[in-house]
Amino acid sequence: MPLYESSHEMDLTTVSLMHPDAADWFAKRTSAWRDWPLADLYDRKGDTRISVVLPALDEEPTVAEIVTGARTLMPLVDEVIVVDSGSVDRTAEVARQAGATVHHRDDILPGTGSRPGKGEVLWKALAVATGDILVYVDADLTDFRPHFVTGLLGPLLDDPATQMVKAFYDRPLLDVSAGGGGRVTELAARPLLNAYFPALAGVVQPLAGEYAARRSLLESLPFAAGYGVETGLLIDTYRTAGLDAVAQVDLGQRTHGHQDTAALGRMAATILHTIHARVTPGAPVWPTLTQFVRRTGTVTPADHPVAHPDRPPMTTIPGYQRPLA
């Protein structure tokens, strides 16, 4: 696997507080989309079948452009599927006109019923997608490029031991630093993963909606029904297949629709529940938070101690007396 440029520039003193497994993983399992030329992927595809899957809810303005872009990769990509989770706009119609195979969530495995949430749609997609590899792409992207797919496929087609590939990218938001994650990532998912699953601290954007995985892996894992699905799959892949089964790829820049603070609060609560359900009771808490900064075209870890001991109650301090007025 090609070495990500920042692994050569990394200041070892910067990562000394990072969990050693995470630091080692970041250095050897991170690459950039340019490391995976399209011609090389065609050579490595063989008889591997590849499905691009878009979960969609009211994404009429953006879904057709993404479908069209993904279809330019045929025959590397064998099918583009949109799973509609109950849109009230023309999402299904415009996706079908753009060439996607469209399924409604409620029509897939009807005997299981339908639950609300993104994870439900991704789970049901397994019952209609025919690929050996599934590439999930959010349907609200406003700047989709075909390399979003090819970058994620690269590590999977290069190494049979790779089971899941996560994307990371710049997010051009005024209140989000370049190279970091979104607000829910920085305020909820990253601190919790660093604390309870520190070996995953090297994952730049654990909530990225763009990722690819082998069907054999996805079929063996539970799917959180809501917005905790990405976090749950990441943790469960790590536990089931090991840290080196996961890779990540820098896709450059990504823009998409944004939600208000109240909606993000609900998302954060769902993710907290998903992570808490996977924490071993009594597990130690890692004392460092690893964040990421964009420098000269690459992303570099920045570590911060966060476990600061409490001061004791003042009444336990020898010689303490309340000052007189």
Please tell me what each predicted stretch does:
Residues 1-27, 259-325:
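Terminal low-complexity segments of carbohydrate-biosynthetic enzymes
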Residues 2-68:
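N-proximal low-complexity "stem/linker" segments adjacent to membrane-targeting elements
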Residues 68-77:
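Short, acidic, metal-binding catalytic loop of nucleotide-sugar glycosyltransferases
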Residues 78, 92-120, 128:
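Conserved donor nucleotide-binding strand/loop of the catalytic core
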Residues 84-93:
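A conserved acidic beta->alpha catalytic loop
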Residues 179-274:
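Conserved catalytic loops of nucleotide-sugar-dependent glycosyltransferases that act on lipid-linked
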